[in-house]
């Protein structure tokens, strides 16, 4: 009977469950958070890149901002941003020359929004060069 009590077979499983599982929980939480942040940054980069492309392809500065805003909103909806996140989208256009669509000009779009789950501000920038023959 004493030999059966001293037998340690199966104790490694108990030690693993008691010690290792609680240590894995923070790792899983971190990886989930990291995946969420990475996904949000990918979405905002696409919005910035396509928004500035739409601006550069337009005929005037006014229509460029309108079309760019429409593109950004459409992409945000299609890539899964919530309506509260879409409402927090902020865009800032910087041009190296005025009007922005003049030849050899550079347009830089900085866009940001507030993630509804983490309440972090996610930001990205993209720039487009205007052809010298425009």
Regions found by a protein language model. Give the residues of each.
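Extracellular/periplasmic head regions of type IV pilus-like filament subunits
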Residues: 63-98, 109-113
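A generic structural signal for short, solvent-exposed coil/turn residues
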Residues: 36, 80-83, 101, 116-118
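Short alpha-helical scaffold segments that flank and stabilize functional sites
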Residues: 51-54, 71, 79, 129
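Low-complexity, S/T/G/P-rich flexible repeat/linker segments used as non-globular hinges
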Residues: 2, 101, 106-134
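Alpha-helical assembly-interface signal, strongest on the long, hydrophobic N-terminal helix that forms
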Residues: 2-69
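Secondary-structure transition/hinge residues
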Residues: 56-59, 76-80, 134
């Amino acid at each position: 009977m004493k030999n059966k009590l001293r037998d340690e077979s199966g104790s490694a499983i108990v030690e693993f469950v008691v010690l290792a599982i609680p240590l894995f929980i923070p790792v899983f939480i971190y990886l989930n958070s990291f995946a969420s942040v990475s996904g949000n940054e990918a979405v905002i980069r696409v919005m910035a890149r396509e928004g500035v492309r739409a601006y550069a392809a337009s005929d005037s500065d006014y229509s460029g901002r309108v079309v760019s805003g429409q593109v950004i909103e459409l992409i945000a909806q299609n890539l899964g941003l919530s309506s509260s996140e879409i409402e927090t989208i902020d865009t800032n256009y910087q041009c190296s020359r005025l009007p922005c669509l003049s030849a050899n000009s550079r347009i830089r779009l900085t866009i940001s929004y507030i993630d509804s789950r983490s309440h972090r501000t996610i930001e990205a920038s993209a720039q487009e060069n205007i052809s010298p023959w425009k």
